[in-house]
Design a protein with these regions (language model features):
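Phosphate-binding beta-alpha-beta segment of Rossmann-like dinucleotide-binding domains, i.e.
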Residues: 1-36
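Short, flexible hinge/linker loops that cap or flank conserved catalytic cores
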Residues: 26-33, 54, 115-116, 158
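Short beta-strand "acidic-cap" motif of Rossmann-like dinucleotide-binding folds
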Residues: 60-62
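Adenosine-phosphate binding glycine-rich loop
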Residues: 147, 159-186
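Glycine-rich Rossmann-fold phosphate-binding loop(s) that bind the pyrophosphate
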Residues: 35, 42-43
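N-terminal Rossmann-fold NAD(P) dinucleotide-binding loop
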Residues: 46-47
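Oxidoreductase and adenylate-handling cofactor-binding alpha/beta cores
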Residues: 1-10, 51-58, 184-186
Length: 186
């Protein structure tokens, strides 16, 4: 790769510079300070996400009907309590889901949920795929309710959609995590 790059430098570098500058517009981002992150599920991971978002200058609202006393005590006082999941969905620019897959959470994000989201919301689901109704997600993308759906387990249906961003599922892909798994087995 290095030699290919050196070879391209022998050509007209103004062309390369123009291509790089012209291409930047495709990668515009979103300013996070002042935006609202709604977190569904305030267990260990949800609390860590809340803390990180606060450090980035985001407003954070949380919803967790099963929050424990210990979890509540360790939650930042800057996290505002949503009165309901609907309340959270209506007021969040970003929605991050951190709940286990149970009968009560299957399709937690469904057509009704998507309908009340803010326009152009960004939905992050690093729980389980069945937490969301995929047809509702696709409809939300088509109607611009959902700007992006971000996950680490895309299904065939969602995998190649333009507004679906897939990240690798690497939560347990560290040397320490593998060592801990080995210790638990023994």
């Amino acid at each position: 790769h290095a030699l290919q790059f050196v070879d391209t430098l022998q050509g007209d570098d103004t062309t390369m510079n123009k291509q790089a500058e012209d291409g930047k517009k495709r990668f515009s981002g979103i300013e996070l300070p002042g935006r609202t992150l709604g977190i569904i599920g305030l267990g260990e991971i949800g609390r860590l996400v809340a803390d990180a978002a606060i450090k980035l200058g985001m407003k954070v609202i949380g919803y967790d009907p099963k929050i424990t006393v210990d979890s509540a005590w360790s939650l930042s006082s800057e996290v505002k309590k949503a009165q309901s999941i609907e309340d959270l969905l209506r007021h969040s620019d970003f929605i991050s889901v951190h709940v286990p897959l149970l009968d009560s959470t299957r399709h937690l994000i469904n057509a009704s949920s998507v309908k009340i989201m803010k326009q152009h919301a960004i939905l992050l689901n690093f729980s389980r795929s069945a937490i969301v109704d995929e047809d509702a997600i696709l409809n939300g993308i088509a109607t611009n309710k959902i700007k992006y759906y971000v996950c680490d387990f895309p299904s065939e249906k969602l995998q190649h959609q333009k507004a679906v961003i897939t990240l690798p599922h690497l939560g347990a892909s560290t040397q320490e995590a593998e060592d801990n798994c080995a210790v638990m087995v023994v």
